[in-house]
Amino acid sequence: MSRFSSALQLTDLDDFITPSQECIKPVKIETSKSKTGAKITIQEDGSYVQESSSGIQKLEKVEITLADCLACSGCITSAEGVLISQQSQEELLRVMNANNLAKLNNQRDEIKFVVFTVSQQPILSLARKYNLTPEDTFEHIAGYFKKLGADMVVDTKIADDLALIECRNEFIERYNTNRKLLPMLASSCPGWVCYAEKTHGNFILPYIATTRSPQQIMGVLVKQYLAKQLQTTGDRIYHVTVMPCYDKKLEASREDFFSEVENSRDVDCVITSIEIEQMLNSLDLPSLQLVERCAIDWPWPTVRPSAFVWGHESSGSGGYAEYIFKYAARKLFNVQLDTVAFKPLRNNDMREAVLEQNGQVLMRFAIANGFRNIQNMVQKLKRGKSTYDYVEIMACPSGCLNGGAQIRPEEGRAARELTAELECMYRSLPQSTPENDCVQTMYATFFDSEGDLNKRQSLLHTSYHQIEKINSALNIKW
């Protein structure tokens, strides 16, 4: 079963096959010229051997990186084994063990400051698995990471709030100055973004919001803001995020999120809910409660909050649609809304909300989850029949709470039942208010400081790139 979202799996209908069958990345093999030719044979262990007049030579194994796959118009899931190996629990444990050894031997030049950022959805997935409250779960997970050698464990709320504020501002700007680029499409789901770049290219990309996802905003905060507070540099920090889907591994590997100045990626490693479960299982722990809890770190310039697991309005995928809808209603039409009702259309994964005044439709927003609804939305946009001003798009059915790397339901239980439980847990969380002292202080002291008018744009926004289709004989299906 594939680990990536359906938006990536279904780029081509026959995509779920092994790398040796399908990967079309051109590879240069250094061989000596031979007038007599050479024969390549496959050995029993799967290795390749070249036989020529000069002798027998074992060919080197092709190495394909995440960056290669993001720049390729071919498959995604066919190279899945290669991708996961570079963003995996094994790689994380290798780095942590090496760092702990460097600390033990006082090898200061080799020691890195390790930061774990944990998003809400994995916390809820683990809380449900181990029958704990979300706050207790987070503290036990923090204790586990500290035991591995983490120096700091933080939540994502500040990045979630920054993403919401930047998205709302971007929407207002578009609505007032460039309505041709409406509907504005959400940008926080990497599965959707990757699919858009590879399949619809320059037609769809201008509609996608440029605001970075919370994961990548956290990357900026950790590698730049936190590095400055610690009086170090970004390449001296190893940043790990815990996310609900495998597509976040692809997002962290985008070249857009590599800093030439810091010589490091904003996020070095992404692990998922399932991988955390596997790591805990490897310790033969019957319950997460057996792990000593640890307080969550708070490195931001305001008073420490009373809670660290927060929810957002309307959806478990960040609450973009409802937050922007309410803000735009107030800002554009002077309409104050306490709640927004998103009504299901053909299915629960396609919902819409409409702002009306005197029988006239002022705004129309939608939430589109899952590949089927994404396809329908894009086709309507291409035919010029889209009536929406904003669409919150997530590749996974039911959104991020049902991310592809969330812990699976027990045997005999439907995934839909588990998702409903997680949604209930999410709605019980304290509601985040993006306009808070912490966010305002970060804007004043970091993003808008020093008179640099481009700093906020460069650190909180990104760009997208059409992936050209490769016309190669290797693409031909027989």
Curated annotation (Swiss-Prot):
Q: Which GO terms describe its cellular component?
A: cytosolic [4Fe-4S] assembly targeting complex
SUPFAM superfamilies given in the database record: Fe-only hydrogenase
Please report the name of this protein according to its UniProt entry. Answer: Probable cytosolic Fe-S cluster assembly factor AGAP009023
Q: Which GO terms describe its biological process?
A: iron-sulfur cluster assembly
Keyword line: 4Fe-4S, Iron, Iron-sulfur, Metal-binding
Belongs to which family?
Answer: Belongs to the NARF family.
Q: Which InterPro entries match?
A: Cytosolic_Fe-S_CAF, Fe_hydrogenase, Fe_hydrogenase_lsu_C, Fe_hydrogenase_ssu
Which Gene Ontology MF annotations are present? 4 iron, 4 sulfur cluster binding; metal ion binding
Is the keyword Signal in the record?
A: no
PANTHER family of this UniProt entry? NITRATE, FORMATE, IRON DEHYDROGENASE
Under Gene3D superfamilies, the record lists: 3.40.50.1780, Fe-only Hydrogenase (Larger Subunit), Chain L, domain 3
Looking at the record's lineage, which domain of life comes first?
Answer: Eukaryota
In this UniProt entry, which cysteines form S-S bonds? none
Q: Where does [4Fe-4S] cluster 1 bind?
A: C23, C69, C72, C75
Annotated positions binding [4Fe-4S] cluster 2: C189, C245, C396, C400
Role played? Component of the cytosolic iron-sulfur (Fe/S) protein assembly machinery. Required for maturation of extramitochondrial Fe/S proteins.
